[in-house]
């Protein structure tokens, strides 16, 4: 999940039982001006329609298939015009006085204000379209055309054709927008990402459309994907050519990092205090790991204990192991009354498609306008068949690790959260998710489920949960320190190896991610804010149950946690 205002990224959205019409309503306030009738509902509806037109890729991901095949204009002039439109919308939002709004509209107003301010921060203050190739990468993923069966494959590939034809123009805009010299870490990320797209278009798309009977469509796809592959390869080569002048200047700097937290998470805490909070949580989890390892692997070093957990593989392989875990996790959530389950839909489990195996596991949740017939799929990547037997075995996670990945992604993590957001009458809450809310909830769910008895009596399961937590703690500290100057990239990499027990390759990847995704502190940041809110709310409501807290927390959509805190206890103060 990227650090932009959160939208349909790595954790996409599920369709509600009754999706809004895919037909475009009579648009009002499409330019960001206050609605003619002065109502908040009309303004919010008009804003959503304006965003769909400005970013048709976002619209397609949300399930608005009248936009299939269209892509946004990323020329500098278009980006500047879009920023001006967002500024105008922000000014219009300021005209809606709290005294004239009901509580639901007031929350939605502040929610939408945050959406706009977050996008403006990344686009105009942090200047990500001009500094960071990663800004573009997640906005180019065509998986919705390939894996979401909202229409027969030929129809979906017609949409993919329009997308592919747009790619050469997009890569030209990306090259024109990026200012040189670029940071080394950004070049590495960009070259890997755009190079991956080049390989995808060249090698992995032809087998997908080979089954088509329509010779004309097949020919057009062949031509378009070849041109897309060339343009991505050329962009990759250009980025590689920038290595000679590359810099180490990836950091936002402490003032901008703090502004990032204020704008994108509504968190205003001195960075020194945040670092102290993060180190305290790291030490808490290391202490818990020592306790678990004293039982699971007595007298062994912590790294050896973690290695023992990783060596115990899921029965039947990763996909079958995950499928079994989902049934058990859902039953555990119900039996323990952890949180309500809004509907009876189930997530499918499948191997990740060959073109999308960069992450070990992810969940694809169709957007809120999508047909309910389009299923949610939890994807797990198998080891590469070209690897050695030892490499394949090492890649398969231990069952203790996989259990909490499944809890994070599905029950009661991202998938269950999506059921709540799509049951919410606010389309704003279904379309935009806050990074710290979404990833914070899913990460919070891992430890909460252990505390409620998941894996009880099995120290191996606790070791699995804690290794996930330690990785997120080191991300938290790396994000702060990489961007404020208290840690080098090499020191971050070392910390991932020594404190999160990552192997050398994963440690390098995790440290690099911190340079181009400074918001990846969101996992631990969100978890800590949710834990604090839970403690404060339960103290004020001593007769309340855990299920009541979770149901109430998830009922607000997925805005920044401080906004939920305001709704639940009356103040944003004391979020951490």
What residue ranges belong to the model's regions?
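Sec-dependent signal peptide recognition
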Residues: 1-2
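N-terminal maturation segment of proteins
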Residues: 13-576
């Amino acid at each position: 999940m990227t650090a932009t205002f959160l939208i349909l990224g790595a954790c996409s959205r599920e369709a509600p039982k009754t999706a809004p019409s895919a037909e475009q309503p009579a648009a009002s306030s499409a330019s960001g001006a206050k609605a003619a009738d002065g109502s908040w509902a009309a303004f919010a509806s008009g804003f959503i329609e304006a965003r769909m037109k400005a970013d048709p890729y976002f619209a397609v991901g949300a399930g608005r298939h009248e936009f299939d095949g269209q892509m946004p204009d990323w020329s500098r002039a278009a980006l500047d015009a879009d920023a001006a439109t967002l500024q105008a919308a922000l000014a219009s939002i300021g005209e809606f006085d709290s005294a004239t709004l009901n509580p639901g509209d007031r929350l939605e107003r502040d929610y939408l204000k945050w959406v706009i301010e977050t996008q403006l921060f990344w686009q105009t203050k942090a200047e990500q379209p001009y500094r960071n190739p990663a800004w573009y990468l997640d906005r180019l993923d065509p998986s919705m055309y390939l894996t979401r069966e909202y229409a027969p494959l030929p129809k979906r590939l017609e949409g993919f054709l329009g997308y592919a034809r747009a790619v050469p123009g997009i890569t030209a805009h990306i090259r024109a927008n990026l200012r040189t010299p670029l940071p080394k870490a950004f070049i590495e990320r960009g070259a890997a990402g755009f190079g991956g797209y080049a390989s995808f278009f060249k090698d992995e798309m032809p087998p997908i459309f080979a089954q088509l009977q329509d010779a004309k469509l097949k020919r057009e796809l062949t031509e378009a994907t070849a041109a897309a592959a060339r343009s991505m390869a050329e962009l990759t080569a250009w980025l590689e050519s920038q290595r000679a002048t590359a810099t180490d200047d990836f950091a936002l700097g402490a003032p901008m990092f703090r502004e990032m937290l204020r704008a994108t998470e509504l968190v205003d805490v001195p960075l020194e205090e945040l670092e102290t909070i993060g180190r305290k949580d790291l030490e808490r989890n290391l202490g818990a790991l020592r306790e678990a390892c004293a039982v699971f692997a007595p007298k062994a070093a912590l790294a050896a204990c973690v290695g023992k957990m990783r060596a115990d593989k899921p029965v039947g392989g990763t996909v079958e192991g995950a499928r079994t875990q989902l049934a058990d996790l859902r039953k555990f959530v119900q039996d323990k009354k952890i949180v309500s389950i809004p509907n009876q839909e189930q997530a499918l489990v499948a191997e990740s498609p060959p073109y999308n195996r960069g992450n070990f596991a992810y969940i694809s949740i169709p957007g809120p306008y999508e047909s309910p017939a389009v299923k949610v799929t939890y994807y797990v990547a198998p080891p590469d068949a070209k690897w050695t037997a030892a490499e394949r075995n090492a890649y398969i996670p231990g069952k203790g690790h996989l259990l909490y990945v499944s809890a994070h992604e599905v029950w009661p993590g991202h998938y269950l959260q999506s059921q709540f957001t799509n049951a919410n009458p606010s389309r704003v809450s279904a379309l935009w998710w806050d990074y710290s809310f979404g990833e914070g909830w899913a990460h919070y769910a891992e430890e909460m489920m252990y505390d409620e008895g998941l894996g009880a009596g099995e120290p191996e399961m606790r070791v699995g949960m804690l290794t996930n937590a330690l990785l997120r703690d080191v991300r938290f500290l790396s994000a702060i320190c990489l961007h404020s100057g208290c840690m080098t990239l090499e020191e971050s990499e070392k910390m991932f190896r020594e404190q999160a027990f990552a192997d050398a390759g994963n440690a390098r990847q995790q440290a690099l991610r911190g340079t181009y995704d400074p918001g990846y502190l969101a996992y631990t940041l969100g978890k800590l804010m949710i834990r604090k809110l839970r403690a404060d709310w339960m103290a004020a409501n001593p007769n309340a149950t855990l299920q009541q807290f979770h149901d109430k927390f998830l009922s607000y959509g997925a805005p920044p946690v401080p906004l939920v805190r305001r709704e639940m206890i009356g103040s944003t103060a004391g979020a951490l």
